[in-house]
A protein has these predicted regions:
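The feature marks the mature, well-folded catalytic cores of soluble enzymes
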Residues: 1-344
Length: 344
């Protein structure tokens, strides 16, 4: 167990030092649509680098990637980008990246085990990125490789509350035979948290992660929860998400008050090769001064989601990013990114 020393896991809307992307390449599952996914990553890189520093982990040559990006980004954006060459299995920085705590005196870089969402996919290269990257970053490195934890499986309000899902953290392919009580104790100790709120519903059809919180419920300022819900009784997910909504209404803040709930629409089903993909508007990315919202070529629902998210973040520009290529591999924008917070 770690001593607290005033460390905490900041909320994502707090000031960020930089953001990480892990770049797609031809030896990943992106190969059949590499041009399409590269376009999405270029769009993300542009919006990030306009507002904060960007770290790009890349298996391909940094020089060739820099040259390609310079054709699409301005000099000011390119000056904010740092490249780090490293072998990678895939691109999901949210789940293989560092989870970073801050205190008045510095940062703590928590390196957890990433096992491909319960050994579903090869992850040995991605699991080794942080140990290589640590030499280039400021902060105290903390080896937590004996515990499986993905960044997409937790949400923090920055004030001691962690929200997660039981279907993911209690999955037998993660930290078995640890009990729920043991896992909660580990989270509180490692993340310097006072309490952990567990959600038991809301698993998207097609989700490979066993129910990451960042696909269904997100924290926002002023004790606000943004969550997805279905209005279609014929949707196979309708009942599960109705149960999630009921559970959210029962949650209380640390001061005992109900959360402010903002309901996001459920995208119309997106089918690929006969299977439904886990499209969600909850997988947005918070930047300094902006929020990147995944869109799915559904003008009405895309606009509604952006409007609702804008209401939760009135001081930020709301930017839609076409994420139809990303969802082909069962993820979205938040899954592609990992923020490194600034020291207060």
């Amino acid at each position: 167990m770690m001593e607290r020393n005033n460390y905490r896991l900041p909320a994502e809307w707090e000031r960020q030092d930089f953001m990480q992307l892990t770049w797609p390449h031809e030896n990943t599952d992106w190969a059949p649509i590499l041009d399409r996914i590269t376009e999405v990553y270029v769009n993300m890189a542009r919006e990030i680098a306009r507002r904060e520093r960007l770290l790009i982990v890349t298996q391909k040559s940094a020089d060739s990637l820099r040259a390609m990006l310079s054709e699409h980004l301005g000099d000011a954006e390119m000056a904010r980008i740092t490249f780090f060459e490293c072998d990678t299995n895939d691109t999901w920085a949210r789940d293989h990246g560092f989870i970073t705590l801050v205190s008045d005196g510095g940062k703590r870089l928590l390196d957890y085990c990433f096992n491909g969402w319960g050994m579903k996919f090869a992850a040995e290269k991605d699991n080794a990125i942080n140990a290589k990257l640590k030499e280039t970053l400021s902060g105290d490195y903390a080896d937590r490789l004996d515990f499986v934890l993905e960044g997409g499986s937790i949400e923090s309000d920055g004030c001691g509350t962690i929200i997660t899902t039981s279907q993911c953290l209690l999955a037998p392919n993660r930290n078995q035979p640890m009990t729920k009580e043991q896992i909660e104790a580990q989270l509180k100790a490692d993340l310097c948290a006072d309490r952990v709120l567990w959600l038991d519903y809301g698993n998207l059809v097609g989700d490979d992660t066993d129910g990451h919180i960042d696909t269904i419920v997100r924290l926002a300022p002023n004790d606000t929860l943004l969550y997805i819900a279905s209005d279609d009784p014929d949707d196979e997910q309708f009942e599960d998400f109705r149960c999630l909504e009921r559970q959210l209404k029962e949650l209380r803040t640390a001061s005992g008050e109900p959360y402010n709930l903002l309901r996001l629409p459920m995208p119309d089903a997106i089918i690929e090769d006969g299977e439904r993909l886990p499209a969600t508007y909850a997988n947005f990315v918070i930047l300094n001064g902006a929020v990147l919202v995944p869109t799915y070529g559904q003008p009405g629902k895309d606009a509604e989601a952006m409007r609702i998210i804008g209401g939760a973040f009135p001081d930020r520009e709301i930017i839609g990013i076409d994420s139809r290529a990303v969802i082909v591999q069962h993820g979205s924008l938040h899954c592609c990114t990992m923020q490194f917070p600034s020291i207060p």
